[in-house]
């Protein structure tokens, strides 16, 4: 478990949980992960998530993964901007993930949002991850 990149740990937990057909995975708590989970829930990639508290007063999320006819809804989830190489884009130069079938999650000055909402708001930012 890499403590230098909690977003990559979160994405790997989701990917591994879907590949092993788990119904629920647990991920560490952070405000960025909470915002990403809200976007995944609103776009229909997960069934839901709850915030829990361990006996040692450490917060974590339980994420309910979504399947359609036994097939994971998330085909590909990947980290784009990494700690060693950041990836930024403007609102006009924002790429589309899988020709618009997937979505990028972007950290902007107005908060963390999907690429569609960032284009609509006219803001660019750091591309955190892509989901298809």
Swiss-Prot record:
Organism, as annotated: Ehrlichia ruminantium (strain Gardel)
Gene name for this UniProt entry: rpsH
Subunit structure: Part of the 30S ribosomal subunit. Contacts proteins S5 and S12.
S-S bridge residues: none
Protein known as: Small ribosomal subunit protein uS8
Molecular function as annotated in GO: rRNA binding; structural constituent of ribosome
Record's function text: One of the primary rRNA binding proteins, it binds directly to 16S rRNA central domain where it helps coordinate assembly of the platform of the 30S subunit.
Keyword field: Ribonucleoprotein, Ribosomal protein, RNA-binding, rRNA-binding
HAMAP family: Ribosomal_uS8_B
PROSITE patterns linked to this entry: RIBOSOMAL_S8 (PS00053)
Single GO biological process annotation from the record: translation
GO cellular component labels: ribonucleoprotein complex; ribosome
UniProt family annotation: Belongs to the universal ribosomal protein uS8 family.
NCBIfam families assigned: PRK00136.1
InterPro entries to which the protein is assigned, alphabetical: Ribosomal_uS8, Ribosomal_uS8_CS, Ribosomal_uS8_sf
